[in-house]
Amino acid sequence: EDIIAMVALYRPGPMQFIDSFIRRKHGQEEITYLHPGMKNSLENTYGILVYQEQFMQISKEWCGFTGGQADTLRKAVGKKKIDLMKKVKPEFVEGAVKVGGATREMAETFWTQLEEFANYCFNKSHAACYGLIAYWTAYLKAHYPDAFMAALMTSDHDDTDRLAIEMTECKHMGIDVLSPDVN
């Protein structure tokens, strides 16, 4: 779960919350929610909006959105469709006030956070896939460094800039890089 969260947080939208996420995880910062009605959706991520599914759940529970409306919101946010977001915003704010018991100011504040979050946010399944690849990659590099670096350099054989970086990494790891030898 931690790797998945870090993959999702390391994006331009939620990246600003990485330090807070870590402090909250380790009990060094209080976990807060803009509204108590968000606790169910944000509890697993220490009160921080990390995944698309979370704002979809909040829109259903806090704003009274249907599944279809929540999916429209996801499309608007995920694809940065500004016109669609402007169309959905009044429904979201009104729903938060009427259904969720939020103040208009609170609903507007969350909407602003949602707009910031829209910058390249991930759904959890994408983060999980990338996290799994990152885990495998780290495992292979740690346990089979020679083979890993050889495969990496082979895959980048036509990119001299990448090869230079990888050769420096080999040197740092204590791996000898030998020049081609036909004998």
Each model region followed by its residue ranges:
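Noncatalytic, beta-rich nucleic-acid-contacting surfaces in large DNA/RNA-processing enzymes
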Residues: 1-183
